[in-house]
């Protein structure tokens, strides 16, 4: 399962995750980035003929994960820290935003819910 930030860029086409809960490993480990009191591991992989926001396509997938579950309220995700790291170390730049959401994703027969308020600082 996954709770965190999910989004896409175009030019280049990149699908990205910042996992605040759940493990999103897989792909090649690139480096780590410190943000909001956590050390996130950055993994990237290349997806071939996979579903995307423009239909079936080839694209990069970036995943930052720290593997623990935050508790309480007012958790912060400073996206600029992740984007700067991806831009510097991803090898493709970062592209133009298409969309970005706070997401809960469940698989393997699991389900879940979240009560959240999203705000911009």
Describe each region flagged by the PLM:
Residues 1-35:
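Extracellular-facing segments of soluble proteins and assemblies that are Gly/Ser/Thr-biased and enriched
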Residues 7, 20, 44, 64, ...:
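Surface-exposed beta-strand edges and flanking loops
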Residues 7-10, 25, 58, 111-115:
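Polar low-complexity intrinsically disordered regions enriched in Ser/Thr and small residues
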Residues 37-42:
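Short, isolated positions in well-ordered beta-strands
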Residues 46-94:
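Beta-sandwich interaction modules
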């Amino acid at each position: 399962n996954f709770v965190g930030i999910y989004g896409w860029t175009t030019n280049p086409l990149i699908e990205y995750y910042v996992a605040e809960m759940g493990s999103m490993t897989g792909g090649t480990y690139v480096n780590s980035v410190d943000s909001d009191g956590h050390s996130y591991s950055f993994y990237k992989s290349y997806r071939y003929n996979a579903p995307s926001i423009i239909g079936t396509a080839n694209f990069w997938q970036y995943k930052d994960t720290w593997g623990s579950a935050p508790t309480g309220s007012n958790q912060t995700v400073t996206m600029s820290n992740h984007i700067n790291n991806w831009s510097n170390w991803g090898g493709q730049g970062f592209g133009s935003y298409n969309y970005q959401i706070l997401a809960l994703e469940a698989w393997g027969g699991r389900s879940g819910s979240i009560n959240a308020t999203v705000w911009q600082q």
